[in-house]
Design a protein with these regions (language model features):
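Conserved, structured core segments of small domains
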Residues: 1-117
């Protein structure tokens, strides 16, 4: 992990600790994303813990088309998951990208609602 990735890892971990229920932040500036639809990337599915977080940071740094980081707490298994995330403005396009990435849901950031696929 290079110096820039390490800085993102530390910042990302702090964001996760401050937002225990979940969050989505812009990959470039780590500012909250409040509109559009968050679609997790299949390649970082089931990333949890420090190792999972490091994998997501590395993946995003190597894939410039990934424009956000996400994290969410799963009450069913009591684990905090991290995702490389694409923010899509159009609902139908987001749903299609979600299906391509084998997701069970996407997230409407403006209304803070899960959309099952």
């Amino acid at each position: 992990m290079n110096k820039q990735q390490t800085k993102f890892l530390i910042a990302f971990a702090a964001i996760a600790m401050a937002n225990k229920e979940g969050f989505t932040v812009d990959a470039a500036n780590l500012q909250p994303v409040t509109s559009g639809y968050a679609v997790a990337v299949a390649d970082t599915q089931n990333s949890f813990g420090l190792e999972g977080l490091a994998n997501v940071v590395k993946y995003v740094s190597e894939h410039p088309n990934i424009n956000a980081f996400g994290g969410w707490y799963n009450r069913e298994d009591n684990m905090y998951y991290f995702d490389a995330t694409v923010i899509v403005n159009e609902l139908e396009a987001a749903k299609e990208l979600g299906r391509v990435n084998k997701q069970i849901a996407i997230f409407d950031l403006a209304n803070l609602k899960e959309i099952r696929l």
